[in-house]
Amino acid sequence: MLICNDKSNPKTLLEEIMALRPWRKGPFEISQIKIDSEWDSSIKWDLVKNATPLKDKVVADVGCNNGYYLFKMLEHGPKSLVGFDPGVLVKKQFEFLAPFFDKEKKIIYESLGVEDLHEKYPNAFDVIFCLGVLYHRKSPLEALKALYHALKIKGELVLDTLIIDSPLDIALCPKKTYAKMKNVYFIPSVSALKGWCERVGFENFEILSVLKTTPKEQRKTDFILGQSLEDFLDKTDPSKTLEGYDAPLRGYFKMLKPSKR
């Protein structure tokens, strides 16, 4: 949890926080008020925080949401930090949080998507984190290309995506929805993902972790509006989504942009 012992008026603060729902990423604590977000993002952060050193590096978080991971990255001493997310509400959440957790104003927040990266930030970053974005893209290869071209030579990509458990070079393409999400297009096997990354030009593809999503990590709270994981799974068989697909399984990976291609 990110904690800030500020002297703000708790009542006014809580009103501001609730007006910014739903809070997907967190948790945060400000003036003893806990923002109990839908996702316990510390679980994911613990899996990727030591993937590569961030000290004195130029770092990006693509799909940064409200900035939770950016604030955690500050603790590792990067040279600079840029977050990318086109969402309007999550930027408002970031603007609310930044005075508490980025008092030196080191973070740049860009309202841009992954498709904008290579044009606006070519060969710019030593490290890019892209967590929970790839399966939302209609063209995952184009998204990987954009990430590749935004990295410096010998830059590293830390990637998290939904995956399917299969030894084959295949991807699940949900017919209409996956776990009630309409914007999920391709969920690859690890082997298929490795092939995509290598076709784009990445090398040294490394599996950091594979983890099932559980109610400990994603659940309904008073700080979101609507449903969460428990509502997306089959009540009689939680190993399946409501649509009959395998329940969410996430892979965490690291790869390198080589010096020559």
UniProtKB/Swiss-Prot annotation:
GO BP terms: tRNA wobble uridine modification
Record-listed E.C. numbers: 2.5.1.-
Any one GO molecular-function label of the UniProt entry: methyltransferase activity
Catalytic activity: carboxy-S-adenosyl-L-methionine + 5-hydroxyuridine(34) in tRNA = 5-carboxymethoxyuridine(34) in tRNA + S-adenosyl-L-homocysteine + H(+)
Alphabetized UniProt keyword annotations: Transferase, tRNA processing
Enzyme category, top tier: transferase
InterPro entries to which the protein is assigned, alphabetical: CmoB, Mo5U34_MeTrfas-like, SAM-dependent_MTases_sf
One Pfam family from the record: Methyltransf_9
Binding locations of carboxy-S-adenosyl-L-methionine: 25, 39, 44, 63, 114-115, 135, 250
Function noted in UniProt: Catalyzes carboxymethyl transfer from carboxy-S-adenosyl-L-methionine (Cx-SAM) to 5-hydroxyuridine (ho5U) to form 5-carboxymethoxyuridine (cmo5U) at position 34 in tRNAs.
Quaternary structure (record): Homotetramer.
Family: Belongs to the class I-like SAM-binding methyltransferase superfamily. CmoB family.
Protein name: tRNA U34 carboxymethyltransferase
Organism: Helicobacter pylori (strain ATCC 700392 / 26695) (Campylobacter pylori)
